[in-house]
């Protein structure tokens, strides 16, 4: 989704794409990020993406913000299907973790603390060990680089938007 958006909007870098998209603080739009079908939490290889709520006042920045929100909501959709209870913390790695704004958006949409680690080497192993119930303290000496606390003022906003997100796919 992010590669597609960067290419279509002709951003020269991800940094510029993120910076532009976060100039807007909220968006009335909704984005379903099913550009190549969907495999989780539902299986539908024919599912397609959608940008809902667009009008003549919609600009590139609003669309960017909405695409990023849609990516976060799709992750939340998977997490809700997978977990009985939402976790209190998630470790974020990869390219999007380089954007502080995206990390904060992720925390706000999920209403979960997002943790970045100083050392990301062997992070996949950490995930496997954690999912097996082996305590992080016993296996690694990773330290937190930064924590992103969810903005409680956005809790209701994103809860309503997520409910709309959940209902949007089946109605298309």
Model-assigned labels for residue ranges:
Residues 1-93, 98-172:
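Active-site core segments that coordinate phosphate-bearing ligands/cofactors
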